[in-house]
Amino acid sequence: MKNKIKFFLILIFVYSCSLDTKSGFWTKTEKLNNTKTKKVFVEKKVLDQEFNTQIKIKLKNKNVKNSFLNNNSNNNGNNNFTGSFKNISKYKFKKISNFNNLKPELSFTKNNSVIFFDNKGSIIKFDENSNLEWKTNIYKKKEIKLNPILTFSNNGEFLIVVDNLGKYYAINITTGSLIWSKKNLAPFNSQIKILDDKFFVVDYTDTLRCFSIKNGNEIWKSTSETSLIKSLDRVSLVISDNEIVYHNSLGDLVAVNIKTGNLIWQTPTQKNLLNKNTFTIKNSDIVLDNNSIFFSNNENNFYSIDVRNG
């Protein structure tokens, strides 16, 4: 009973204190000084004004147009395209997986035919009127399930094909029949360049390989420094006189002798690049114009490099 009385008295005391406004026990207040506020994230303003309105750019009247066929410089020149499509046709085929990263391209022939492939690795050739000339597929069922990505180049007689499974082969460009087929130890991830009776391609080990068009035998190979983590970006190549130039997975630009594969020069383009960052690097195709090589990347870098010495 005594405990209940004590509890009741304590409760009355606390309650009476909470109602007290004169003693200052509960009413003591403190005024806060006005503090300055600063925005951490400032909204970006879109500029809608034109810069350098007085600058005039004069373009040549004559367009310089280089052929798309077996273009070993990746330089198509200044083309005038009206944007008009007079004839449009459609052909349905299986959607290509990972299309954006691997950037597969069409292959064109001298008689305006177009060559492409579908998600099963079938190669399809159309004439200039969109009529199907031939369709061929050399892959086995287990390979088709892997959705091979093909890369093409042709010299008017042979269609050279490499893929991301490590296969490389030659197709008769007129009939679509297989001439020879071989297997590389590593998948390919580059453009193909053809010169005379040879073709050149880079695989995922950053090895540039030179093969015979006639039978697919390897003539020479040239290795460069590589990264542990590989980018999905396709490697670009150009041919200049006696050398072939490409960029490896580290972002280095590499030039080798086109006859022997011996290193001529190697120029790094990335400073303190960690292996984990090489996966995100994406380079444009390298373009050769006279003695200069031009290319850019997704790190907001643009390069002009002398092809003679790097």
Task: Show where each model-derived region lies.
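Extracytoplasmic beta-rich repeat domains
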Residues: 89-108, 132-156, 178-196, 218-241, ...
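Blade/loop signatures of beta-propeller domains
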Residues: 33-49, 53-89
